[in-house]
Structure formats: C-alpha cells, structure tokens
C-alpha cells in the first residue's frame, strides 16, 4: 500500500475517533506540527519533473581565456568559467534536461602567504570569502546575470550551490553588515542564521536563480533549515522572470541537501521527523550506491549485485517522512565516474560494447525514478579519466588530481564547444536525450506510484502509474539475453503493451506477455489499457530471528579469555555512533568461542564491520551481506569491505561472532530479540 495514502487514511480515522470522544482542541503534537514550516506543495509538484545537469565550474569549459583559477583538484584544465557554461547552454538544452546546478561561484580571496593547497581549495568555491560577489576568476555579476537569463530562455532552471555551514577564514560581512558566528568550519547556529538567510535571499532577488543545492547540509540544524526554506520561498515569491514559454513565473525555490549517508542519518540531519520538516529534498546517496553496485562496482570495488539489490534500496524509501523528495544521481564531483568504476571492477573498457550497455542501463534507472534526478556533466557521453581506474595512494593522489573524491573533476567535453564526440559518445548522448524527452512526457515516470513486479539476480521490473499514464520499466542486470513472462493481472493491463522507444507492441496472450530483453537492456512499455493491478496484500513473513545459541539474547557473559585477544565492536554508519567505537556496541565473551552484544537498532540498511579500536583485527561478512536470522561465514575485513546489514524492523538485536580455537573467524549473525 502507498505509504502516503496509508498515513493519510490513518490520520482521518484518528481524527474521527478523537471527534467521537469529544476532543476539545489540538494536541501538543498537533500544535507543534502547525507551528512548523511545511514543505511547499507547489514546489514539490514541479520538483518531481526536475532533470538537473550538474556543472563543476572550474573544471567545465574555458569560455574566457583572460580569467580562470589555473589550479584546483582533479585533472582538468582548471580554467572553467561562467562564459564557458553560457557557451554550452545549447548543448545542455539538447540533452532534454530542464535545470543546471553550478558548484559555488562566490569569491574566495587568497590570504597572504597561503599555500598551493589553499589555492586549489579556492578554485572549488566551497570555502567562500565574499558570499555576495561573483569570483572574478569565474566572471562578473553581469556574466552571471546573462547566464541565468539565457538559461531561463532555454527552459532551464538555475540552481546555485549554498555552503551555509562553513566558510573561509577571511569571510567578509554581508551588505547589511552581518557575519557568520563561531568557527569557520562549522559555523555556529542559530547565531549564523541571519547571515545565511541574507545569502539565500540575495541571489534569488538579484539574479532570479531557482534555488539551492546545499553543501554538507548536516552542518545546519533542522530548525534553521525551516527558517532558510521560508526565506527562500518568500524571496522567490517577491520576484518574477519570463520563461521560455513567454510566461511570467516566480523562481522555483527548490532546495536539495547533500547528506552523504544512509536513510536514517538523512532523516535525522536533513528531512526531520514526520510533520516537522527540516528540508524537503535530499540526494539519494543510498540508492546511488546500490545503482553502481548493480551495474558496475562502488568506489571500494564491491559490486555484482542484481535487481533484488535495487528493489531493496527503493523499498527503504519507506523510512523517509511523507514530505521527503529524494533526488537520484549516478555521480557527482566527489564520486568516481561510472566509466572509471567499470574499469576499476575489471568489467569493461570504453572499447567494449558492455561499457556502453551498462551506462545505458544505469541511466535508464534514473529516467524511471519517481522524483528529481541529476546528471553529472560527462555522464551523458560515458566520460572517464584516461589512465585511471584503481585507487591511487593518498600520499600522491592529490598532487596528481587522482584522489577518488575529486578525480571526476575532469575537463568538460562539450560537443561543438570544447570537444568533438566519437560515435559511441554520440550514441549514448542521443540515448540520454531520448530518455529525458520520454521522461518529461510521462508523469508515470517522474511522479508515478511505484509497484515492484520482479526483482531477482537477472532483472528488475517496476510498474509506474500517475492518473491514466501507466508504464512498465524493465532493466536487465545480467549480460545474458532472456525472455520475460509477465502476468497481465499483476501488471494491471487489459490490452497491449507498447514500447515507448521503438513502438513495438506486445499483445496479451493467455493472460500474459512475453518480452525479450537483451543483456543490460532497458525497456519502457506503456500499458495501453491500464486497470487495477492484482496485488498480494498478504504480508510476507519476515525472517528476523534466527535459531541456536547465536540467536539468543540472554547468554551470560563469562569471565574467561576467548580466542580473540582484543575487544571488538560493531562499528558502522549507525546514527548513535557514526563509525566510532562505542561502549554500547562492544562485544562480550559468552564462552564456546562466541562473542555477542545486544543493541537497540533502527530499521534500515547499515554498512559496518566488526573491529578493535585500532582496526586490527577487523572482520566482515563473507559476500558483504548480512540478513537477520541467517548465519553467515565471517572473514577478515579491510578498508571498504563493509558488511551491508538489512534490518527490516526496529528493535533489540543481538550481534554474534564465532571464532575457531586458533582465533580465525568463523561465523556472524544478527538476530532480532524475541
């Protein structure tokens, strides 16, 4: 059942019950909800349709040879500027996107005697001196104004990058004399709030930008985000511009948070609780990782997943409050490019067909995603960094521009502007344009209710519907061809299915459809005659509790030495520990080579290892996956080889490790306490 429909229905029933009991006024919780600043439904409605193209300004395109930083992180020319973006607007528009996001463009003034590392950091824009001036190495206020106006004339929203939690040490006052308070990283709230409210409003009113991407949004408390959201809404309503259709409109006022973590941390530091929103949209880092782990590998070379891995990640959206609007991306300026991940995993090279097929599969998933999506420049042409694939040592990678957190900041390859694309690149670009155009024409894709039909090692299939627009999205997660038999009753289809790209029709035969799917192929099939799908509402039994001594939560601790000499901890991205060794997550020895710790856990998917405080030894589950109640082999861990533990329910869990007599790892289990 739709979480939002369920909650809405439940709210009505509760309200009716309260009325029947003679409730005389709002409860304390209701007063708190009414006092909070709600997410703007008009902004949310339009934001579903966002197809954003991200530009790293200093590395993108050199449009003015007289300016530029000339240094920075990554392997680019480091001469990118605003004019280069203006020169690329026709190309960007041709992709079928409808928005651009620029990394920070505000002035970062050198401090006398600063070293080359500070010069490189200045080029990123992420530590600004003057939030109210355009960096002269990027351009002028007039150039920025021209960029925004020309983008709007092409039907492109423009989003700036807001760094509201840190700044350069030589930060200068706002036009009204305000300054951020506290240290430079992070600043102090609520004292810094008026300064950043002024920043947020200034650029909307001055240039009529359409909103903000929010860097390290966890640095700003939820209450401050409510105030900044209201400032952005008010500023957006105070000005207008004429769009590409000749309509007079207000700036959109969209804001999207960067919180590089799991669903629970994104809730805690970004979205806020149900009924009391902090922020309304955040990048979907959890699903991004599952996406690359399915079609390539992640930055730590872990991959080989299938459709069920994607389905599990999408199902975890249920953890978010109703106002949450995740924004999915394949990459960004802090992540390794998808093409380089394919090479890191020894999966495919740019000369291989599969390199391009896997790109198309991953990008198709974005096109079928409900909510805003973001493309990083170069995604559309399968870009990669020459002579780079494996991780480079931290001692030398920054000098070479090859650290994982900045290697994707390569020079922009814009056809007809800064590069000439080859046939493979042109083909992928045309495919992306086709996807974006199709997505814009089908509300089922960008706003539809999602029903997963099939998810296994070989394929992922969703049914998407918005009003009478219904589409079946299929994507292969294997290199083998297959024939899919799809039941019409399950799909909610009473007639043909029609391929939205090829026009091919699949007739209904004996209650089902047969759809061929090549390796890593994606298809979008319109349901010509949609009906209510037959959904099995019987709750599937969840196995969360195991059997045997490893599943017992009350085994007594024994006062004797076990086979492991150091104290071990469950260490991971839990909201109560954040990869720190906490006493409440320390294992105790129970005898028989068994170590256990009982903890209170939230529902969700967590990345973790079992380690001593000095990380020697450290252990992980074999296969890097752990399911509740299932005994799994334990093996030696290392950096990046994290166990992904899926806990479908909140509650008390026991974590158990067993070892051989000689101290070698044996098995691991997590089990919900009964």
Regions found by a protein language model. Give the residues of each.
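Carbohydrate-interacting/catalytic domains
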Residues: 2-5, 9, 13-16, 20-56, ...
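N-terminal structural segment of carbohydrate-active enzymes
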Residues: 25-156, 211, 215-216, 610
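Conserved, mostly hydrophobic/aromatic
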Residues: 55, 92, 102, 131, ...
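The substrate-binding groove and active-site-proximal loops of carbohydrate-active enzymes
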Residues: 70-83, 125-141, 169, 179-193, ...
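Short, acidic/polar
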Residues: 79-91, 189-205, 359-363
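Aromatic- and acidic-residue-enriched segments that line the glycan-binding/catalytic groove
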Residues: 110-127, 164-190, 230, 266-282, ...
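Active-site-proximal helices and loops of the catalytic beta/alpha 8
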Residues: 198-199, 205, 210, 215-326, ...
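Aromatic-rich carbohydrate-binding modules that target alpha-glucans
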Residues: 554-605, 611-639
């Amino acid at each position: 059942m739709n979480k939002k429909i369920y909650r809405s229905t439940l709210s009505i029933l509760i309200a009716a019950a309260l009325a029947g009991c003679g409730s005389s006024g709002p409860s304390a919780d209701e007063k708190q909800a009414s006092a909070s600043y709600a997410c703007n439904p008009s902004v949310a409605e339009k934001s579903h349709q966002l197809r954003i193209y991200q530009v790293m300004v200093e590395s993108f395109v050199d449009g003015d040879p007289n300016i530029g930083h000339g240094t920075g992180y990554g392997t680019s020319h480091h001469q990118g500027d605003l004019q280069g973006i203006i020169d690329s607007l026709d190309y960007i528009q041709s992709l079928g996107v409808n928005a651009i996001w620029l990394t920070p463009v505000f002035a970062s003034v050198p401090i006398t005697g600063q070293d080359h590392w500070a010069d490189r950091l200045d080029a990123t824009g992420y530590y600004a001196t003057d939030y109210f001036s355009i960096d002269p190495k990027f351009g002028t206020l007039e150039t920025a104004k021209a960029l925004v106006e020309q983008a709007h004339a092409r039907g492109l929203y423009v989003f700036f990058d807001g760094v509201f939690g840190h700044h350069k040490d030589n930060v200068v006052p706002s036009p009204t004399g305000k300054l951020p308070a506290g240290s430079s990283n992070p600043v102090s709230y609520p004292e810094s709030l008026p300064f950043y409210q002024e920043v947020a409003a200034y650029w909307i009113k001055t240039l009529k930008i359409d909103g903000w991407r929010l860097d390290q949004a966890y640095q700003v408390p939820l209450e401050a985000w409510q105030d900044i959201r209201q400032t952005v809404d008010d500023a957006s309503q105070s000005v207008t511009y004429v769009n590409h259709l000749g309509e007079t409109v207000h700036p959109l006022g969209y804001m999207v948070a960067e919180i590089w973590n799991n669903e629970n941390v994104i809730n805690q530091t970004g979205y806020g609780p149900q009924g009391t929103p902090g922020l309304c949209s955040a990048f979907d880092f959890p699903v991004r990782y599952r996406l690359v782990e399915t079609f390539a590998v992640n930055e730590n070379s872990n991959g080989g997943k299938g459709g069920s891995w994607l389905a599990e990640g999408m199902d975890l959206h249920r953890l978010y409050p109703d106002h949450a609007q995740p924004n999915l991306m394949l990459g960004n300026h802090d992540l390794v490019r998808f093409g380089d991940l394919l090479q890191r995993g020894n999966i495919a090279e740019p000369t291989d067909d599969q390199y391009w097929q896997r790109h198309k599969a991953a990008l198709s998933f974005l096109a079928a995603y409900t909510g805003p999506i973001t493309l990083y420049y170069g995604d559309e042409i399968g870009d990669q960094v020459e002579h780079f694939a494996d991780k480079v040592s931290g001692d030398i990678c920054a000098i070479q521009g090859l650290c994982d957190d900045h290697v994707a900041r390569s020079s922009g390859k814009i056809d007809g502007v800064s590069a000439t694309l080859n046939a493979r690149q042109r083909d992928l670009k045309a495919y992306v344009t086709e996807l974006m155009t199709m997505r814009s024409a089908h509300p089922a894709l960008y706003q539809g209710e999602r029903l997963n039909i099939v998810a296994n090692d070989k394929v992922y299939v969703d049914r998407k519907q918005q009003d009478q627009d219904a589409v079946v999205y299929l994507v292969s997660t294997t290199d083998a061809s297959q024939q899919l038999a799809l039941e019409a009753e399950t799909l909610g289809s009473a007639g043909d299915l029609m391929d939205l790209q090829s026009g091919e029709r699949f007739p209904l035969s004996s209650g089902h459809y047969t759809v061929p799917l090549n390796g890593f192929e994606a298809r979008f099939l319109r349901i010509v005659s949609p009906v209510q799908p037959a959904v099995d509402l019987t709750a599937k039994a969840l196995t969360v509790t195991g059997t045997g001594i490893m599943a017992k939560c009350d085994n007594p601790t024994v006062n004797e030495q076990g086979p492991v000499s150091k104290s071990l901890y469950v260490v991971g991205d839990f909201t109560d520990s954040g990869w720190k060794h906490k006493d409440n997550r320390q294992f105790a020895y129970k005898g028989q080579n068994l170590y256990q710790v009982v903890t209170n856990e939230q529902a969700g998917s967590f990345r973790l290892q079992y380690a001593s405080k000095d990380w020697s030894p450290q252990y992980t589950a074999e296969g890097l996956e752990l399911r509740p109640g299932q005994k799994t082999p334990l093996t030696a861990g290392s950096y990046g080889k994290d166990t992904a533990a899926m806990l479908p329910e909140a509650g008390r869990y026991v974590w158990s490790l067993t070892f051989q007599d000689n101290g070698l790892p044996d098995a691991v289990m997590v089990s919900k306490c009964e």
